[in-house]
């Protein structure tokens, strides 16, 4: 475990050095993400100019949900997206060989090679929006609620990582699988919508089979006490995320057995 922590810290440091070597690019992408996030807030503001509620969600509760989704999506993008999205290219070019020969777990090797640290700033912006929303709602969460919320964010990132890893692993059979990976990255935006807008069957699918909707809805509900009890909410998130992470691990090992290296 200590060796993995040391390797992870080295990769983080190298990514920071690389990002600082291209400051203009770092700032440009950060600005683009901020503008995109502001666009989401404006989008829901326009909707609430016509209605008072979306289901049982008020305006500032939805803004809190959008801020929560921003934090999860940007943390996922900061620590995992670049690496997972690059797996199809590693397989196609045979450069995956250089990672498989390392004396570390192959999934760890492909998942921690590079980081997009500019996304951390955008995740912090989501946190600011959550705090403003809580203030507007007159909610002062207790330390336990805050702790559960932060833990739930981590599980949300794990769900995104697990699903995307499974899609990227399809590249062991389909040479160009980038479309699946980037398609899911766009699809995950449905997590920013209140779950009540979906029909019951889709709430079941997006809550258990492909649990993308719950990853932001459950953390948000943990802060808005009137929306549910914390124990069943956390239990749902923990069970769903654990299952999907385990399945991604199994599928990665299965897919790896079908890899034909460039040297073979």
Where are these regions (language model features)?
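Hydrophobic transmembrane alpha-helices and immediately adjacent juxtamembrane helices
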Residues: 1-264
């Amino acid at each position: 475990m200590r060796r993995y922590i040391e390797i992870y810290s080295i990769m983080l440091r190298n990514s920071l050095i690389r990002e600082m070597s291209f400051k203009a690019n770092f700032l440009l992408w950060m600005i683009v993400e901020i503008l995109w996030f502001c666009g989401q807030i404006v989008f829901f503001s326009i909707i609430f100019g016509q209605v008072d509620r979306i289901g049982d969600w008020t305006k500032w509760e939805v803004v809190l949900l959008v801020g929560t989704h921003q934090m999860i999506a940007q943390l996922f993008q900061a620590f995992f997206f670049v690496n997972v999205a690059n797996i199809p290219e590693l397989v196609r070019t045979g450069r995956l060989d250089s990672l498989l020969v390392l004396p570390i777990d192959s999934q760890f090797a492909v998942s921690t090679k590079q980081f997009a640290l500019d996304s951390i700033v955008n995740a912090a912006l989501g946190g600011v929006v959550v705090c403003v929303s809580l203030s507007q709602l007159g909610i002062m969460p207790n330390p336990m609620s805050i702790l559960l919320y932060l833990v739930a964010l981590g599980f949300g990132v794990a769900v995104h990582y697990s699903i995307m890893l499974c899609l990227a692993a399809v590249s062991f059979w389909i040479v160009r699988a980038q479309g699946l990976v980037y398609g899911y990255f766009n699809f995950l935006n449905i997590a920013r919508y209140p779950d009540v807008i979906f029909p019951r069957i889709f709430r079941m699918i997006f809550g258990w089979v492909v649990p993308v909707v719950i990853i932001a809805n459950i953390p948000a509900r943990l802060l808005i006490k009137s929306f549910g009890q914390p124990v069943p909410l956390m239990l749902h998130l923990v069970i769903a995320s654990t299952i999907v992470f385990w399945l991604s691990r199994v599928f990665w090992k299965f897919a790896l057995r079908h890899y034909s290296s460039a040297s073979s």
